[in-house]
């Protein structure tokens, strides 16, 4: 009986980090779809004073964090057209401790940048619409899902 309990304890200690990592990755994949893909592009009411102000209010609400991110990238393309670039990710980005890749195709992207001329308690954003390639973070090396956008090329 004692050896069964010891075996169970060892299994819990070994498997728990894997389960937590799996849950974290699944959340990151879900958040990528929700927070970085807007296709077709939504229109926010005029009261939001622009696309990025409406979007970033949504992003902060979804993350349950009222911190104002300095920059946020939103891709206006179907998820599947972005996802395929994480199928074979040979690069490892040590700064992020994740696999990463540069897309071969350009995508329509809105870059939301925090307006520096504002009160510290408000989050006001400028919108820039561009068409560029993406540096993506991927959930693993092969057959992966995108979990973040780390820059443009």
UniProtKB/Swiss-Prot annotation:
BP term (GO), one: defense response to Gram-positive bacterium
An example Gene Ontology CC term for this record: extracellular region
Record-level Gene Ontology MF annotations: nucleic acid binding
CDD domains: RNase_A
Signal peptide residue numbers: 1-22
Keywords: Secreted, Signal
Subcellular location: Secreted
Disulfide bridge partners, by residue number: none
Top-level taxon: Eukaryota
Family designation: Belongs to the pancreatic ribonuclease family.
Function as written in the Swiss-Prot or TrEMBL entry: Does not exhibit any ribonuclease activity.
Protein name: Probable inactive ribonuclease-like protein 13
The organism of origin for this protein: Rattus norvegicus (Rat)
Gene that produces this protein: Rnase13
